[in-house]
Amino acid sequence: MKKVVISLFALLAGASLAMAEDAGCEAFKWPVAREQALFTAAPATPAGAELAVGAAADLALVPAEKAGFTLPPERAPAQGTFGAVASVDVPAGGAIQISLSGEAWIDVIQDGKAIKSAGYSGVKTCPGIRKSVRFKLAAGPAIVQFSGAKKAELKVAVLTPE
């Protein structure tokens, strides 16, 4: 009988944990299930690489002072943090959504100008995803700068919004 009670408790605790994780991700303003799926197999990617729309990358960051930012980040990175610069080819329609596994600032630059975000959602209770930011751009090349990260790696997904 004692084993049955312990087994039931373990099942209920596991179900509660799974529900809590789902509830944490539900707090985002838009779904992040695609990012969660992509992050599990994100390939290691060096700073300076091109990020593909519809994919994720496990981006290697460098000390912020060595990142080679095209423009100074809108939010100055704290001492001892990491950053990177990457490029993306924005598809027709121009809307992209950049989601991150951890805390970092995102700046998008197109035609030499910093582009303000069109939407932001961030939660601390979703496993593996910290923030998701939307931008409305012109089709064509853009630069994405990541700064202020506390770790030297960051999973990044670039998607078209659902």
Residue ranges and their predicted role:
Residues M1-L8:
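Bacterial N-terminal signal peptides that target proteins for export
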Residues A13-A20:
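N-terminal signal peptide c-region/cleavage motif recognized by signal peptidases
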Residues E21-E162:
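Acidic, Ser/Thr/Pro
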Residues L8-L12, A56:
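Generic hydrophobic/packing signal
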